[in-house]
Amino acid sequence: MRVQPSVKKICRNCKIIRRNRVVRVICTDPRHKQKQG
């Protein structure tokens, strides 16, 4: 899980979702998981 000031999609399986005001990227590749905040 990477915590970054700006999150981006890395591949086409990445999805950007918002949970409790936290922007997250979920993906089939665990290395692509990101969180903003």
From Swiss-Prot:
The keyword S-adenosyl-L-methionine does not apply. One of its GO terms (molecular function) is structural constituent of ribosome. GO terms for cellular component: cytoplasm; ribonucleoprotein complex; ribosome. It comes from Chromobacterium violaceum (strain ATCC 12472 / DSM 30191 / JCM 1249 / CCUG 213 / NBRC 12614 / NCIMB 9131 / NCTC 9757 / MK). The keyword rRNA processing does not apply. Belongs to the bacterial ribosomal protein bL36 family. GO terms for biological process: translation. PROSITE patterns: RIBOSOMAL_L36. Pfam families: Ribosomal_L36. The gene is rpmJ. SUPFAM superfamilies: Ribosomal protein L36 (SSF57840). Keywords: Ribonucleoprotein, Ribosomal protein. HAMAP family: Ribosomal_bL36. This is Large ribosomal subunit protein bL36.
